[in-house]
Design a protein with these regions (language model features):
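Extended, loop-rich substrate-binding clefts of extracytoplasmic carbohydrate-active enzymes
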Residues: 32-105
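Broad, structure-driven detector of short, well-ordered beta-strand segments within folded domains
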Residues: 1-9, 79-89, 149
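Generic recognition of long tandem-repeat/solenoid scaffolds
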Residues: 1-4, 10-15, 55-66, 98, ...
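Acidic (Asp/Glu-rich), glycine- and aromatic
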Residues: 97-141
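Beta-strand-rich N-terminal accessory domains
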Residues: 1-43
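Intrinsic-disorder/low-complexity loop/linker signature
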Residues: 1, 21, 53-55, 133-134
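Generic structural motif
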Residues: 6-9, 20-22, 35, 62-68, ...
């Protein structure tokens, strides 16, 4: 699923991965912290397009969500960086390709802060192997444990 199950109060949205009926990853989206908290700023969804022929879902989003900035009981504080971006999820054979395209470069002050966050559901992955960017390992049996090489 891509940007279909959105729960703004719980700050849940983005790319969710479901394999054999079990959610294995969620909240795949751009965030301003590597491990976002409950009251962290989230983007505003502008559009979502499904292209069945190319097996692609494209979602257009923006920061900040001006309707949420500094409002409510626990006000959200958006960083001073306005931009629009697209998250594209494409099925290619037995793989999923996720790409993120921003409408402008990331300012130097946000390098290392603005990141694509994908939260894995650890108990399903404990002890299972992973491969990413020519690296491989085994998921730890504790959520905060070391990843085995």
């Amino acid at each position: 699923m891509a940007f279909m199950d959105i729960y703004p109060v719980g700050h849940q949205a983005g790319v969710s991965m479901i394999m054999h009926g079990k959610r294995i990853a969620t909240n795949g989206d751009l965030r301003f912290e590597p491990t976002p908290g409950q009251w962290q700023a989230v983007p505003k969804q502008l559009d979502r397009t499904l292209d069945e022929k190319s097996n692609t879902i494209t979602t257009k989003l923006c920061y900040p969500d001006k309707d949420q900035h500094l409002t409510g009981f626990n006000p959200l504080l958006y960083p001073d960086f306005e931009f629009t971006y697209e998250v594209r999820v494409h099925g290619e054979g037995g793989h999923i390709v996720v790409s993120v395209d921003l409408d402008r470069p990331v300012p130097e002050e946000f390098l290392g802060k603005l990141c694509f966050n994908l939260e894995l559901v650890p108990h399903i992955l404990f002890g299972k192997p992973w491969i990413m960017d020519q690296k491989q390992g085994i998921f730890p049996t504790q959520p905060n444990g070391p990843t085995l090489q």
